[in-house]
Amino acid sequence: MISLDDELAGEYLAECCEHMATVETGLLAMENGGAEIAEEEVNRVFRAMHSVKEGAGFFDLAKIRELAHQAEDVLALIRSHDLVPTPDRVRVLLRASDRLRELIQDSTHSNQADIAEILEALAMAPADRTSPL
């Protein structure tokens, strides 16, 4: 693991803030657009979440990686049109985004964070693909 004091880690964390802004903007667009959301917007959100996940793995930020991975899985289903971004599902993704921001802001202690509740909510998102949560 590279120290979070490391310059490279600082750059990663700064990029995470940018990625999370992209995620939030895109999720809000999804909430408003639902199934009519532009494919490029979904791809942009997916890529931003993927970048957060991959960097977290590099820096051994296990909880950030785990949460980003679970959110990315839901986004992948939306991206492949296997899941409709209903308002309830998007709200779960927004909650995950908010929690990720908190973990990124306190990255030094993020591996001790309790993320079970939001992981469970994300796991339930695709449970019924034909109707809202």
Language-model segments: residues:
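Non-catalytic helical tethers at domain boundaries
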Residues: M1-L133
